[in-house]
C-alpha cells in the first residue's frame, strides 16, 4: 500500500493513524508512506508507525553520478519521537530514501489549481514522488516471492 499523506505534527508512532498502519502490517500488507516535505527533523503520522516503510527523498543534483546524491532539502528526516518502548531501532526514520526531485509524472489536462496542461505530464518534486518508486520496488519483490512478509519486503527494499 502506497500512501502520500500525513499530519503536520511530529509523532511517536502511537497515534491512531500509525496504529492502523501497524495493523495493516500485521495482516500481511507492506505500507509505504511519504515522510513529508517540510525539511524538518520530524516524522509525521502515519509515517511514524513502527512498521511503516517511511520514504524520504534524495536529490540527484541533476546528474547521473550517484556519489553526490543528497537528502533533498525539503525531505523530512528523523529520528521519530521516542515511544517509550525501549526499542531505539523503530525511531530510525526514514526507512529508505529514493529519487524524489524533478520527477516527470503523468498529469491530467488541468492541475489542482485548474490551470491547463496540454502536455499531459508535469515535473514534480517531493517525498510523494519518491514513495511510488519504493512501492514499485516492493511490488517487484512480492512478485518474485509471493511468500514474503512485510518485514522481509522492508529488508529487501533497504538492500
Predicted regions and their residues:
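Extracytoplasmic/periplasmic, Sec-exported soluble proteins
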Residues: 9, 13-16, 38, 47, ...
